[in-house]
Regions:
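A SIS-like phosphosugar-recognition module
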Residues: 1-175
Length: 175
């Protein structure tokens, strides 16, 4: 659940509407982070990403070799090779698109993406990825002039939940 971890780190750290001095910002801070391993996202959010009206910059992470060292050959290639082919194909599809007379099958392309490719998922490569993304989050916070190290936005929900559990709905509604 690496995407979920990055989601928590990034969105909780930089999802702010005020800067370090408490002044409202007039620019977007903190991207929306989501993802799924392998091809799990293909029948959910990939549809929106390929043909939706919002253009969402994407970042893929992939590995050349299976993390377990052995792999099953299915229809002439390993599952790892199929995953690598799929990530490469998705990047081409997002970038280039495909014209079709049937507008339901038309893909505009021009959708930005990047990829980080490693040899194999190991403790060392996972640590490198974590360091990469944690530093990205920290530097984005510096650039946006937000405090990436407080999470005041989650406190209100916790406070209100306690009031609701205590059947103090009047206080919950006034908070």
């Amino acid at each position: 659940r690496f995407p979920a971890h990055l989601q928590q780190c990034d969105m909780e750290s930089n999802g702010k509407s005020v800067n370090r001095f408490g002044e409202r910002v007039n620019y977007v801070t903190g991207p929306i982070i989501f993802g799924e391993p392998g091809t799990n996202g293909q029948h959910s959010f990939y549809q929106l990403l390929h043909q939706g009206t919002d253009i969402v910059p994407l970042q893929f992470v992939g590995f050349k070799d299976s993390q377990i060292g052995t792999d099953v050959v299915i229809e002439g290639s390993t599952s790892q090779k199929k995953l690598c082919a799929n990530v490469a194909a998705q990047i081409v599809a997002f970038a280039c698109g495909k014209d079709d007379e049937n507008k339901n099958k038309n893909f505009e392309g021009g959708r930005p993406s990047s990829i980080i490719i490693g040899d194999q998922l190991t403790p060392e490569s996972l640590g490198s990825l974590l360091a990469h993304f944690e530093n990205k989050i920290m530097f984005q916070g510096f650039v946006w002039n937000v405090n990436s190290f407080d999470q005041e936005g989650v406190q209100l929900g916790k406070l209100l939940a306690k009031r609701v559990l205590a059947h103090d709905t009047d206080a919950a509604l006034k908070a």
